[in-house]
Every structure is written in structure tokens, then in C-alpha cells.
Amino acid sequence: GKGVVFMGSFSKTMATGLRIGWTMAEEQVTDALLQTRFDLGVSPWVQRTILEFASNGMLEKHLEKVNAIYKRKRDAMLAALDERCSRYATWTRPEGGYFIWLTLAETVDAKKLAEAARELGVAYVGGYAFHIDGTGQNTIRLAYSFANEDEIPEGIMRLGRALEQASQS
């Protein structure tokens, strides 16, 4: 629509090292963006390769494959959470993306959880890191994108133990 600028990146869909993005907007806006000529030194060869990859249908095939992998990982994490953690938290059921957000039950001490999880070898990001107003203390973000699908149940089992240790009930 008029006045809308849509931007994206190939960093998440193809490879994290690719610092190439794209923009869809009215011609006047894209012309102004092109005048900046600021590209962080991205190789013209890499840019051309991405253009060919996207233009000949390979990007769609790649995305189908990647989406199937992420869906399996997400489903594995959701199943493990349902089995092990429902007493201590609720969570999102994302349609896409890379993360599941947990909201801790009032009985769970977030600081104790961080300590217990660390001791059990579980890494997550506390939700407070995503809030500028001090909220989010009772939330955590779990990433399933990088995790090995076969290791997800074990990781969630450990998280469940940490939640149990951090629970006051």
C-alpha cells in the first residue's frame, strides 16, 4: 500500500553470515534508499548469487525445506514442554519463527530458575532482556532453531527439573 516500506533479510532464511537485505516500497522511496549507496561492503558476486537463487525458484524450495525442519523442532519442543513443564509454566504455540515464550507460574522464582538451569546445562534468555520497562521478569525465551532435534526432549527434561527446583510449591 501507499506509504508502506517492507524490509527483510536473508540472514535468517539462508545463512546468518549473509548480511543482505531487501526492500519493497514505492519507487520514490527505493530511489532515495539507492542514493545512500551504503552496503557494508557486501560482495557484488554474493549479491548476484542471491539474486539468481531467489529468481530461479531455489529460494522457495529452500524455504520449504527449512520450514519443515523448524516445524519438527518446534513440535518436539512443544511436546516435551507439554509432558514435563505444564505444572510450572504456560507457553506460546508459534506458527513460525524460532522461539517459544514461557510465562512462569507464580510459584516459580525466576532467579532460582536461572541458577538451577545453568547448573543443569540449560541455556535460555530471560524475558526481561526484551522489555525496557522492567517487566518480563516471569518470562523466558527458548530457541528451537539451533537445537538438535534429538536433544530437545533431554533439554526440556532438564528445564523441567530446574523449574521444579525453583518452584515454591
Listing of model-derived features with the role each one plays in the protein:
Residues E119, T135-S169:
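PLP-dependent enzyme catalytic core of the Aspartate aminotransferase-like
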Residues A129-G134:
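AMP-binding (ANL) adenylation modules
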Residues G8-S9, W22-M24, T92-R93, F99-T103, ...:
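Short beta-strand segments
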Residues G3-A68:
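Conserved core segment of the aminotransferase class I/II
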Residues V108-L113, D150-E154:
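Short, conserved charged micro-motifs
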Residues A68-L78, T90-T103, L113-A116:
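Conserved glycine-rich beta-strand-loop-beta hairpin in the small C-terminal domain of fold type I
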Residues E26-E27, S55, T103-A105, S145-A147, ...:
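Residue-level recognition of strand-loop junctions within catalytic nucleotide-signaling folds
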